Amino acid sequence: MKHFSDQTWRSPQQSAVITYSPAYTLVPTYECFNRCTYCNFRRDPGMDEWLSLSTAQQRLLTVRDRGVCEVLILSGEVHPQSPRRAAWRQRLIELAELALDMGFLPHTNAGPLNRAEMIALQNVNVSLGLMLEQLTPQLQRTVHRAAPSKDPQLRLQQLEQAGELGIPFTTGLLLGIGETSRDRLETLEAIAACHDRWGHIQEVILQPHSPGRQQAIQHPPLAPDELIDCVAIARQVLPTSIAIQVPPNLLTQPQQLADCLGAGARDLGGIVPYDEVNPDYQHHDLDELREALAQQGWQLQPRLPVYPHLVDRLPQRLQTHVAAWLNRFNSQSRSS
């Protein structure tokens, strides 16, 4: 499909363009069988009412005319052996179908999936995501000791499975949870090696641990300089086709965003009304962010939740949805 050529979308590494995804988050359930000590999201299994389709539709109607493109379906994890797992999977599919029917582009992040689950979601999402977090097994004795699905080899297998299936994929590192600099490098190298095999990873999120009021154990925040250093290392390790993302609402120092961009970050992720994972850190006003970046010589532009060079991997039905949004973004760009 020629709409997705490099002539339409310049590589962010070769321009002054900083991208973001105009997004809205739907949470099918906050219940999760993992107990990560730093989590500000989860509720105990059976203690949360699942999101109904009618409620989801009502919420999406409120943002339909606000320029929102991506519907991020971000879910707590129902145990793979739970009798509710099949119903949970079906709710994920139904929410993605609803988003498509209402003119949005869905992206789902719901933890590790078996092959059949991933294929089912592949058919109704323009991309999928899962944070690799850190590959070191040491964290299974500390922050992840009560989080079975944070097994690093299980999560790395998810990246491989997505690659085998040809799914555009987002992954990332959680920084400042007890890992070493060497651990970070090895995690980045593993992502790069997986991408070399399949060419499916579109972006890597570098997310600094940011303490919140709901977490079980208070861990210190990541030092600002460590994030900047990690961005620079990631830009050296990862192929240029993989965008490096930093979440601007988690950058607490005034100069930190500028320094991360200078080190090679080119994407700000989903700008949403409410950060479900980090509820104590809300996003800045988009117009103010755009103006601040412009003063530094950057141009903030919206993007799709699937990167242009990976659109051809999508089912034809999803490519049609993507083409409509790309035409819309291009029209907005020409008129601005």
Swiss-Prot record:
SUPFAM superfamilies: Radical SAM enzymes. The keyword 4Fe-4S applies. It is an enzyme of class 4 (lyase). [4Fe-4S] cluster binds at C32, C36, C39. Belongs to the radical SAM superfamily. CofG family. Consists of two subunits, CofG and CofH. Catalyzes the radical-mediated synthesis of 7,8-didemethyl-8-hydroxy-5-deazariboflavin from 5-amino-5-(4-hydroxybenzyl)-6-(D-ribitylimino)-5,6-dihydrouracil. This is 7,8-didemethyl-8-hydroxy-5-deazariboflavin synthase. It comes from Synechococcus elongatus (strain ATCC 33912 / PCC 7942 / FACHB-805).
